[in-house]
């Protein structure tokens, strides 16, 4: 978690943003060069306040929302949100670049979407009332060439691609079993539920 990392003395004076997680990822790969290795990066992504989620160099869309909801126009809020997505794209690229020569698969999922309208933002609305953008969110899966060079991994990835092609809905509740299953972990004592593993179907 980035706040824990950034509170360490070795990071004094550094900006607090998601890119610090990429450095930790790279360090972890160096410290643990062998065996199976799961790394979880808990990002802030596009959580409000949006302007706190990206450095000034990524303020492409302007004017931005620099205050609380009712002090900003809807367009200013959208601009700031879009800037945060631009920085997330950069974060993902740096993550993938760190893993291109590794036997790696990456799952990226947000916990919720965001609604922006009439100078306010919303998320976490109860499911029965939440608008579609809050509860229907994309998931991204990326794999390195080295990972895909193995036939078993290629077959697993094809199953993931089929879910996309067929527009099959997937749910967070199956993410744990799918990350482990698609990564090649096994669990003879039933720790991985194959009915929840996207790569097992």
List the model feature ranges, each with a label.
Residues 1-201:
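Catalytic domains that recognize anionic headgroups
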């Amino acid at each position: 978690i980035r706040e824990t990392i950034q509170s360490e003395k070795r990071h004094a004076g550094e900006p607090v943003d998601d890119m610090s997680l990429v450095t930790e990822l790279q360090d972890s790969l160096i410290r643990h060069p062998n065996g199976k290795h799961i790394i979880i990066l808990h990002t802030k992504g596009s959580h409000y306040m949006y302007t706190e989620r990206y450095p000034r160099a990524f303020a492409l869309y302007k004017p931005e929302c620099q205050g609380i909801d009712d002090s900003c126009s809807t367009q200013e809020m959208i601009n700031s949100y879009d800037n945060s997505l631009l920085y997330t794209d950069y974060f993902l690229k740096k993550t993938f670049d760190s893993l291109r020569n590794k036997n790696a698969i990456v799952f990226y999922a947000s916990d919720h979407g965001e609604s922006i309208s009439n100078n306010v933002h919303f998320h976490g609305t109860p499911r029965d009332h939440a608008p579609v953008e809050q509860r229907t969110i994309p998931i991204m899966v990326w794999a390195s060439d080295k990972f895909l060079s193995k036939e078993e991994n290629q077959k697993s990835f094809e199953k993931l691609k089929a879910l996309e092609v067929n527009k099959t809905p997937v749910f967070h509740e199956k993410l744990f079993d799918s990350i482990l299953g698609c990564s090649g972990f096994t669990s003879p004592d039933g720790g991985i539920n194959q009915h929840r593993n996207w790569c097992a179907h």
